[in-house]
Amino acid sequence: MTEKANKKYKDSVFVDLFYEDESAEENEIALYNALHDEPLPEGTKIRKIRVENVLYMNFKNDISFDVGGKLIVFGEHQSTINENMPLRNLLYIGRAYEQLVPVEDRYKKKQVKLPKPEFYTFYNGEVPWAKEKELRLSDAYEESGGEEMLDLKVKMININPDQHHEILEKCPVLAEYSQFVEVVRKHQKSGEEQALQNAVEECIK
């Protein structure tokens, strides 16, 4: 499996689980609860959001949802280390707010209320990396010091099984996804042409 194909299958499975499948809403709620100390009340409704304009294809694997006054953004999960996730999320959140706020409301005297954003990215690459790390947009500024008038924080979470991050215990579907990626990786290293199919068969036994 080529590197491009390898990345594509990971993107597809993650987006299916947390955006497109019939159980996606249930999975999103489970992941939200795993990330927060206070779980969502029973029966909470969520609104799924996705920037799908052809002009913004870089966002096609980024998903988000509006729930409880918050806009939870899951930036495209990473199989390679990417320190530019704060910048990508800044571009994404602008487009997401464009979808949420009607044009006419942006020019009214009364302030438009916005869901408070939270940004998360899950890392499952093979290069060793921190169990959890906060990336900040301000770290990329050419000039440091003083008060930043604009900043954005992204929580990067390493979901490789060997990291034993507590989120995998709290969110079984994310743990299953992490384990599936690990099984595919094992079959790939064996040089199998049907690594993905063989991994699927192993995981459903």
Could you say what each language-model-derived stretch is?
Residues 1-205:
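Elongated, amphipathic alpha-helical interaction scaffolds
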